[in-house]
């Protein structure tokens, strides 16, 4: 059996086990009664939220590619987006997602030298939006973290925003090159060139944005709209069990959850995502239903795009490509 097949089977078993375990440990008899009130409208709302999220994601990708001097068809845009979901789920740290996007872009005549910074900036903009939203999250929502006061959370969030904005400037300076060089020498001397190459790739992406600031700002707005629409999947599913859903609070906590998931060590954030979802959203839904909603959210937001991405990648490159990338 190939490594690709073993990893695919492992991921399927892991996802099934995590989903089953979460439902088993969170459901109760009262929840079984609540399930009978499930309405199809909430599922339709979740599908609309997913479609809108993908729409704005496609718009920003098309605009980024256009800033780089190229053009993507709708079919190409969809392939790039869904390939990210597929390979990110199969590889540790979601590292395969970026590789898949760059290679799919190359198949549509966007060279790797242009595709790499475009993909990197796409990710950077998503993280930047979440970081910038952090102060608003902690101002609006009284999220409690053990041993950390609300004032400290606000201070940390404002510092994170300032560091992010300042970092976009410092990345282009010679001081950052010296810092990265010294850091690479200290930790992995034999990979110093790789570290500097990644910094140069990021700077190339930022240089593209600086050339067209208005278009870049629109890309940032589209990034935020895409993420917020995707985060609306959660409150849409909650409407299946209750009409009293504080949408703004739910979106606030989804921002915090997904920012944490960007740094989750497990493939696709499996296990961590469901656990955090239960911790953050249990107070807002009927007793015993949060596990079902958590699993439904993951299915809608991650697993459905994963299988669409699997079809997109396999029809474009075949099994050899997937086997090669998952073996790295």
Where are the regions a protein language model picked out?
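Predominantly cytoplasmic-facing regulatory/coupling regions of multi-pass membrane proteins
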Residues: 1-82, 148-261, 300-328
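Transmembrane helix boundary and interhelical junction motifs in multipass membrane proteins
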Residues: 55-58, 91-102, 260-277
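Transmembrane helix-loop junction
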Residues: 66-67, 89, 107, 139, ...
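Membrane-interface alpha-helices at helix entry/exit sites of multi-pass transporters
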Residues: 75-76, 93, 98, 108-124, ...
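Extended non-transmembrane interhelical loops and adjacent amphipathic helices
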Residues: 78, 82-109, 196-203
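Mid-bilayer segments of alpha-helical transmembrane spans in multi-pass integral membrane proteins
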Residues: 85, 89-95, 123-135
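Transmembrane alpha-helix termini and helix-breaking/packing motifs in multi-pass membrane transporters
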Residues: 133-144, 310-311
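Hydrophobic alpha-helical transmembrane segments in multi-pass integral membrane proteins
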Residues: 199-202, 265-269, 275-298
């Amino acid at each position: 059996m190939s490594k690709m097949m073993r990893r695919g089977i492992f991921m399927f078993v892991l996802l099934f086990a995590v989903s089953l375990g979460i439902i088993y440990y969170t459901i109760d008899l009262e929840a079984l009664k609540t399930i009978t009130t499930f309405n199809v409208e909430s599922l339709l709302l979740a599908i609309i939220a997913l479609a809108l999220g993908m729409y704005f994601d496609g718009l920003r990708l098309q605009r980024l590619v256009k800033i780089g001097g190229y053009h993507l068809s709708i079919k190409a845009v969809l392939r790039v987006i869904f390939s990210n979901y597929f390979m990110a789920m199969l590889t540790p740290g979601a590292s395969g997602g970026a590789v898949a996007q760059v290679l799919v872009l190359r198949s549509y005549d966007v060279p790797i030298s242009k595709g790499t910074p475009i993909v990197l900036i796409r990710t950077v903009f998503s993280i930047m939006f979440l970081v910038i939203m952090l102060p608003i999250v902690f101002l609006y929502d009284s999220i409690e973290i053990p041993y950390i006061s609300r004032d400290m959370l606000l201070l940390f969030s404002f510092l994170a925003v300032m560091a992010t904005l300042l970092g976009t400037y410092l990345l282009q300076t010679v001081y950052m090159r010296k810092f990265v060089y010294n850091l690479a020498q200290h930790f992995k001397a034999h990979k110093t060139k790789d570290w500097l190459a990644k910094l140069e790739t990021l700077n190339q992406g930022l240089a593209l944005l600086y050339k067209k600031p208005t278009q870049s700002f629109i890309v940032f707005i589209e990034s935020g709209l895409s993420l917020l629409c995707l985060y609306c999947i959660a409150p849409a599913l909650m409407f299946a069990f209750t009409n009293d859903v504080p949408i703004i609070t739910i979106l606030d906590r989804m921002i915090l959850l997904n920012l944490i998931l960007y740094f989750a060590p497990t493939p696709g954030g499996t296990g961590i995502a469901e656990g955090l979802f239960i911790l953050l959203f249990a107070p807002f839904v009927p007793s015993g239903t949060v596990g079902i909603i958590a699993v439904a959210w993951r299915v809608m937001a991650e697993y459905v795009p994963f299988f669409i991405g699997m079809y997109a990648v396999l029809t474009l490159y075949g099994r050899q490509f997937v086997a090669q990338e998952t073996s790295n």
